[in-house]
Amino acid sequence: LERTFYIIRHGQTDLNKQGIVQGRGVNSPLNAHGLKQAEAFYERYKEVPFDRVITSTLLRTHQTVEKFIASGIPWTQHAGLDEISWGVYEGKPQDEEIMSGFERLVKSWTDGMLDVCVDQGETPDEMKIRQESAMLDILELTKSDKLVLICTHGRAMRMLLCLLTEQSYAVMDSFPHTNTALYKVRYDGEKFTIDEFYNTEHLNGLNE
């Protein structure tokens, strides 16, 4: 039953670079630098005999692990791994008004108010329900697998790591992320243990 999940965030998109809010409702592709990050991750981990690749339904995660998929590893998309919905903020530049709104929102979350969200967006409580359901599906899907590559999104990854380590989503910011950063998480059939925390070694020497 033991298996290891390599959980990564997608590569850079132009909207990441421009500071535009993406979220679940924005389906932007990787930019040239994001494709380089994906290539660097592939070169570093292509010898790992992954049994399965699981991504969100959004293009940026598909492109990040495209070479693993192209090599013939079975691939599953799961909407439960999609980014949080940022509601009315999605697709908008992070100007002062949006940034201050973001800061207030994340402060509320880290203060334990997990039932608040951007107008028309998702709350951490709603994300937890979505991610719990996704992980039940994923554990069932991977029960005969040993090594699984998961590509998801920044905020979604932080929240998922809280879920897997049985911590409140209020501590989500204790899990740093950057594009293609890796968390290696082992499952022993009962609980999850983080074996590698925020590994970005594959990005060494990669300039924008």
What does each model-found stretch correspond to?
Residues 13, 156-157:
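Short active-site segment of divalent metal-dependent hydrolases/proteases
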Residues 4-10, 150:
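Short, hydrophobic/glycine-enriched beta-strand segments
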Residues 1-4, 84-96, 140-146, 162-208:
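Acidic, low-complexity terminal tails and accessory targeting/binding regions
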Residues 71-130:
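Phosphate-handling substructures
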Residues 9, 14-73, 77:
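Active-site-proximal alpha-helix that buttresses catalytic centers in soluble enzyme cores
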Residues 49-80, 106, 186-208:
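Conserved histidine-centered catalytic loops in small-molecule metabolism enzymes
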Residues 39-43, 128, 132-140, 161:
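Generic structural signal for well-ordered alpha-helical scaffold segments
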Residues 55-56, 129, 151-152:
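Short beta-strand scaffold positions
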